[in-house]
A protein has these predicted regions:
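Sec/Tat signal peptide C-region and signal peptidase I cleavage site
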Residues: 15-19
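Short glycine/proline- and aromatic-enriched beta-strand/turn motifs that initiate or cap beta-hairpins
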Residues: 20-71, 171-176
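Short loop/turn motifs that connect adjacent beta-strands in outer-membrane beta-barrel proteins
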Residues: 28-38, 79-87, 118, 143-149, ...
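Residues that define the transmembrane beta-barrel architecture of outer-membrane proteins
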Residues: 64-70, 103-107, 128-134, 147, ...
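Transmembrane beta-barrel domains of outer membrane proteins
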Residues: 75-79, 112-114, 139-141, 169-171
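Mid-length scaffold segments of soluble, non-membrane domains
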Residues: 81, 90, 94-120
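Transmembrane beta-strand segments that form the barrel wall of outer-membrane beta-barrel proteins
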Residues: 86-97, 118-129, 147-157
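Outer-membrane beta-barrel "beta-signal"
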Residues: 160-176
Length: 176
């Protein structure tokens, strides 16, 4: 009797061990994504609709319908080894109108996608003295070794009017 109980006990322990050797039907997650810092200076021009110029004038800010832009883009690109589409997250801080002795701050938070060939599209909120709006941007990044030169066009429609920008700059591709 003792031997039978001992055998049943050992058999009971062996069943869970056997269950552990079976391959479970679990999806293995992909390897972690890598991020690349693509931060760098940005500069360009912005065309302001008359409504935006008037809105700024109401706030005692007098500028013409075309202003220069200078600033910095803080960008992180998330990619995988497959070389497919990459996701990006960026904050763009610009000062506009410096050539007119005015400093118009602008802050945009953009999220978007970039193709392996460098074509990109992003969307996100934009805040300026003219108000809050949703920015839409698209462009292409030209690459030469580690040097990247983005050419970006942005459209920012708002209640006050529309802003259209063309920005460029550069950054050095560096893994973080």
């Amino acid at each position: 009797m003792r031997a039978a109980v001992l055998m049943l006990f050992c058999a009971g322990l062996a069943v869970p061990v056997g269950a552990q050797t079976q391959t479970p039907d679990i999806t293995i997650p992909p390897p972690p994504l890598k991020t690349v810092s693509l931060s760098g200076p940005r500069f360009g021009v912005t065309a302001l609709s008359q409504g935006v110029v008037d809105k700024l004038h109401e706030r005692s800010i007098d500028v013409s319908s075309t202003i220069t832009q200078f600033g910095w883009q803080f960008e992180r690109e998330f990619y995988n080894k497959g070389g497919g589409v990459a996701a990006m997250n960026e904050f763009v801080f610009l000062l506009g109108g410096l050539e007119q002795s005015v400093a118009l701050p602008s802050l945009s938070w953009m999220v978007g996608l970039r193709s392996p060939s460098g074509a990109e599209f992003g969307i996100g909120p934009n805040v300026t003295p003219a108000g809050v709006a949703l920015a839409l941007a698209g462009g292409v990044t030209f690459r030469s070794g580690s040097l990247n030169v983005p050419m970006t066009f942005a459209l920012v429609p708002s209640k006050a009017g529309t802003r259209i920008s063309m920005l460029t700059g550069f950054n050095l591709r560096g893994r973080r």
